[in-house]
Amino acid sequence: MVLAAPLLLGFLLLALELRPRGEAAEGPAAAAAAAAAAAGVGGERSSRPAPSAPPEPDGCPVCVWRQHSRELRLESIKSQILSKLRLKEAPNISREVVKQLLPKAPPLQQILDLHDFQGDALQPEDFLEEDEYHATTETVISMAQETDPAVQTDGSPLCCHFHFSPKVMFTKVLKAQLWVYLRPVPRPATVYLQILRLKPLTGEGTAGGGGGGRRHIRIRSLKIELHSRSGHWQSIDFKQVLHSWFRQPQSNWGIEINAFDPSGTDLAVTSLGPGAEGLHPFMELRVLENTKRSRRNLGLDCDEHSSESRCCRYPLTVDFEAFGWDWIIAPKRYKANYCSGQCEYMFMQKYPHTHLVQQANPRGSAGPCCTPTKMSPINMLYFNDKQQIIYGKIPGMVVDRCGCS
């Protein structure tokens, strides 16, 4: 019996060692409590901290990279402008100094009118390239035509409506003159010429043009001294009216022209019928046509809310006032754009040999990068470091197209 007791104790210890490791010493009740704690229900939670979950990736990694590209582009623009203007640093000219210097400068409005400054104007979706083949329109002559019946009362006035093609309406008008032929007078006389803008008659309109139906809006009035017994061609500046017509083509219903002498005789030749050949009123325009033609943009264009991950062109407006660069007179801001996105093999690659090199040695060559493949200049009017006003053209400041290279 003495030998049997140690032997029995050994068997009991061996049985304890052979039990499953996950089973607690207290039996099934303890195992159930441990399972409940692991599931997070019932009982007291374990004081041991749970292992932290790995951080989730950013919700929009493309957006983070895009913001990084924007910041790099802005810094690059700053350095490029200073470098291309041969300035070591931005001129120290405050807004107050600019206000003091501008009135003493030569008239700047002529420069601002003659040269295009890219500002808040919207840029076309398709990029533009220089067109060296098509002719540039310089002078446009528009002959008077019959007015629309909607502006006539008892068939009057028949003259004058001027039609302009969309091509002309998108040019820069440098000068606009309305030419009217005045009949000869037997003796020197003072003639009062007036130009009235026409508009359709309303429901309350009457033949007298009173009330809500009035169709005459005086836009020009001239006093002319005639001394010749022969006819006289009179020119009238019409640039301002033309600008309003081009901005709102639906407002161009035509004009009525009158030139009365002291006796009340209308000397203006406005008849479009026989006997007035070559004497009809006409409009002469001096325009500066944009010598660029639209071409299909082969690159992708995206906005800031796009989920596109491929190489794409994004809008970016550079605000010089936000930089504190008051030394730039014009433009105060411009649309620079920037490129961002991934470049997979054979996606929008600029050069075919790039793909061949990467295929031949994929490990030894860097992948293609999303970069500008077409850029255009901007015009700039600015103060240099000597407080002189300079006009210049800065190349390569607007991204027109992006691609992989």
UniProtKB/Swiss-Prot annotation:
The SS bond pairs are: C302-C312, C311-C370, C339-C402, C343-C404
User: Which GO terms are recorded in the biological process aspect for this UniProt protein?
Assistant: activin receptor signaling pathway; amacrine cell differentiation; animal organ morphogenesis; anterior/posterior pattern specification; camera-type eye morphogenesis; cell population proliferation; metanephros development; negative regulation of amacrine cell differentiation
KW Disulfide bond (keyword) present: yes
Which domain of life does the protein's organism represent? Answer: Eukaryota
| GO MF, one annotated term | cytokine activity
Give the main location.
secreted
Function, in words: Secreted signal that acts globally to regulate anterior/posterior axial patterning during development. May play critical roles in patterning both mesodermal and neural tissues. It is required for proper vertebral patterning and orofacial development. Signals through activin receptors type-2, ACVR2A and ACVR2B, and activin receptors type-1, ACVR1B, ACVR1C and TGFBR1 leading to the phosphorylation of SMAD2 and SMAD3.
Whom does it interact with, and what assembly results?
Homodimer; disulfide-linked. Interacts directly with ACVR2B. Interacts directly with ACVR2A. Interacts with ACVR1B, TGFBR1 and ACVR1C in an ACVR2B-dependent manner. Interacts with FST isoform 2/FS288.
Its protein name is: Growth/differentiation factor 11
User: What lineage does UniProt assign to this protein's organism?
Assistant: Eukaryota, Metazoa, Chordata, Craniata, Vertebrata
